């Protein structure tokens, strides 16, 4: 995959959360990308934080993406409109619940939530790595692993990083056919005794 290079014309900085929200309210429907320049804490410069910016993005149907270094005092965080069929995390589901209770979600943000609930992406939201467990593995993947003694043996030795990776890669598939192929590939990988992330020897 080709590296994503920030477009200088799409780099902006905002001193406050309110300033970023004003920009997104005016541009959420016509812009396709924003590289938010966030100043580091020790820079002494006033800046919206990534946590604040994510709240604003979720309210307007956008989502955060990759982060890139910029200079000694700041970094860039990419924000884009949430794409159809994009996966949700449990963390962002929790953020939406908080923002909804606070009355901050706009109709644009709620539309993304409603679409995710309608097609199952909301229920399939992935857990953070720190809470990844065998119970968090999608049922169809678990069933396929359970049907293979060799895959089951490898699966029993997986740590949180690999459990998270299995769940994420399965839930990231956009179609039933793609999901079935991904599950078959993951089971075959486990049958070979391989893992997505190298496991530490115990």
Language-model-detected regions and their locations in the chain:
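Charge-dense, helix-prone N-terminal extensions
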Residues: 1-202
């Amino acid at each position: 995959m080709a590296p994503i290079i920030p477009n200088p014309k799409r780099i902006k900085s905002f001193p406050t959360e309110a300033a970023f929200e004003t920009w997104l309210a005016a541009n959420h429907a016509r812009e396709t990308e924003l590289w938010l320049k966030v100043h580091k804490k020790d820079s002494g410069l006033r800046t919206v934080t990534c946590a604040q910016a994510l709240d604003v993005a979720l309210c307007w149907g956008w989502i955060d993406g990759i982060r890139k270094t910029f200079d000694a005092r700041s970094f860039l965080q990419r924000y884009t409109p949430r794409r159809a069929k994009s996966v949700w995390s449990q963390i962002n589901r929790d953020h939406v619940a908080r923002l909804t209770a606070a009355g901050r979600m706009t109709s644009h943000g709620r539309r993304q939530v409603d679409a995710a609930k309608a097609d199952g992406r909301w229920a399939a939201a992935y857990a953070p790595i720190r809470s990844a467990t065998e119970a968090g593995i999608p049922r169809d993947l678990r069933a396929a692993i359970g049907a293979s003694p060799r895959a089951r043996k490898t699966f029993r030795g997986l740590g949180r990083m690999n459990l998270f990776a299995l769940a994420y890669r399965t839930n990231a598939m956009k179609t039933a056919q793609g999901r079935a192929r991904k599950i078959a590939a993951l089971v075959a990988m486990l049958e070979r005794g391989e893992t997505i992330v190298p496991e530490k020897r115990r």
